[in-house]
């Protein structure tokens, strides 16, 4: 009995991966083994960077709040401590947005905790 091989499924799998690697440079887009490895590595990077994105944004918010707070004569840590002591529960994302887009609202918050 001859060996049965499912070429249809194999070809479909290869085609699917090669479709996902469209736009990559060189052999990464059209050589099956290289494309497969590149695609898998891309998934690894995506997984890692979904977590790093959260850190990076938090760091960005802190930098923006710190810059705006220093213009008002406070450091970031003193501002956050004062906000906590005053019972003002506003997260860093919103505070950074206020500092950048609505500086008068940010100044009002700082004036409240000074």
UniProtKB/Swiss-Prot annotation:
Transmembrane stretches, start-end: none
MF-aspect GO terms: rRNA binding; structural constituent of ribosome
Entry-linked Pfam families: Ribosomal_L20
One cellular component term from this protein's GO annotations in UniProt: ribosome
A Gene Ontology biological process term: ribosomal large subunit assembly
SUPFAM superfamilies attached to this UniProt entry: Ribosomal protein L20
Keywords: Ribonucleoprotein, Ribosomal protein, RNA-binding, rRNA-binding
Role, per record: Binds directly to 23S ribosomal RNA and is necessary for the in vitro assembly process of the 50S ribosomal subunit. It is not involved in the protein synthesizing functions of that subunit.
Family: Belongs to the bacterial ribosomal protein bL20 family.
Protein name according to UniProt: Large ribosomal subunit protein bL20
UniProt gene name: rplT
